[in-house]
Amino acid sequence: MLRLFGAQSTAVGKTVENFPPQWRAAAQWKSRGAETLVALQAQSPSGLKKAAQALRQAFSADLYGAGETTLPAAVVEALERHDKLLICADAAAGALLEARLENLPGAEKVFDFGAVSYADPKTGPLIEKRARLPKDCTDPLRQALARAQAARRVVGADLSAACAERENDCVLVLSCRKGCFLRTVPAGENPALWLLDIIRRTAANKPQAEGTGFLPARRAAKKDALPGPQPKRHPLRRVCMTLLVLALLAALAAVGAWEYTNGNFYALPEQLHTLLTEHVPRPGATLV
């Protein structure tokens, strides 16, 4: 049995339909939320192996394990294999992860369970200070973005998780060196599993599931910096600048006309006519 998270059930069905007849393989799958379990059957070991390989290749990023492997165990394995340290930037993210990762072999090596991050009496306030949030900031997403990035820098971890809790949903944030992954999870879904999946994919450098966004480091820094409102420009400023340029050009033209006519503006039309007629080609002339 193969275990997928974030894969579309219809995509699994299409892959199974494309199994060549000579494999003599079939599959049954069941989805619960974002998780899909696929049970394979074949009349020969080679057919079973080829069918499993086809699914692994088609859903390489979604596949997190086989048999009795759980998603939390797959996350710990991915963090250990790629030597990544995971922390939480706030209590909301800690509540999602700590209960699911505790008692797993090796979890304490890759996850701090809040001991050196948000729950530490010294590090917690330092994270808030480094987040540089204005006192009047009430946007949960901006708070989560700022804390996730600040916590990763303060602790020196590879990955930092945060959770922005809102009335009808929550936004999961995972900060890494390149930026922040974000995913909005409705109230009816399981945010803990989605956060675990985002962590697993990031640790293994695999593509994220459809619907998970990414904010590059520079944009994320600007977003959590909460820049003040830009000064408003007066609506007539552009018109005034245009009129000023036109007035300047008119003044320059007047000075040129004054010099050309020796101060006699009445002679300007006649002199312009004379200037133009001198340059009109006459019969028999060669135009150079």
Question: Locations of the language-model features?
Answer:
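Membrane-proximal helical "anchor" segments flanking the first transmembrane region
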Residues: 13, 34-40
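Short Gly/Ser/Thr- and Asp/Glu-enriched loop/turn motifs at secondary-structure junctions
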Residues: 31-36, 167
